[in-house]
Amino acid sequence: MDVSIRDDGGNFNYRVCAVMTDHDKILAMRDKRSPFYYLPGGRVMIGETAEQAVIREVEEELDITPEIIRPLWLNQSFYTDDVDGMDYHQLCIYFLMDITDTDLLSKGSRFSLREGHHRHDFEWLPFERLKDEYFYPLFLKKEIYNLPSAFTIRTERE
């Protein structure tokens, strides 16, 4: 069961995301349900650590098993979703991942994979293109250039 709560006042999610980079590009994804780019990842399950969750999500979405280098951010975000129009309070831990010992780069600059009944479209986006793309999280458009050396807590309100 995912750590996710819904009530009349909005939604709460506890999520993880994988930051995977190669030569000033970041791996982003989207699907037909979401018009914007986002990072691979998903909700943490009850009883699961954030580290276990990010590995599980990347395995499910990309069929690879990367290594975690380190956590980068805990981002507290408050927003209204562009797709469902609902209010969200979300905690997301972003992990920098090592993809060296995977076949991820051999998949090409754009590729699609299926996860169950869902098709995910992936693309290696150049850092400088992020500012012009419909991409979440917004803070990453600037902070991708200077990843924190220590775990950082941040808050984002839209």
Locations of regions flagged by a protein language model:
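Short, P/G- and charge-enriched loop/turn segments at secondary-structure junctions
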Residues: 1-8, 81-85, 110-112
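Short, charged/polar surface micro-motifs in flexible loops or helix N-caps
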Residues: 24-26, 34, 45, 74-79, ...
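Acidic, metal-coordinating catalytic segment for phosphate/diphosphate chemistry
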Residues: 1-19, 23
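A generic structural micro-feature
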Residues: 8-12, 85-91, 114-119
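Nudix hydrolase/Nudix homology domain
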Residues: 35-37, 103-158
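A short coil-to-beta-strand element that immediately follows conserved catalytic motifs
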Residues: 65-74
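Conserved Nudix-box catalytic region and its N-terminal flanking loop in Nudix hydrolases
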Residues: 22-60
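Active-site-adjacent beta-strand/loop module that shapes the phosphate/pyrophosphate-binding cleft
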Residues: 79-107, 143
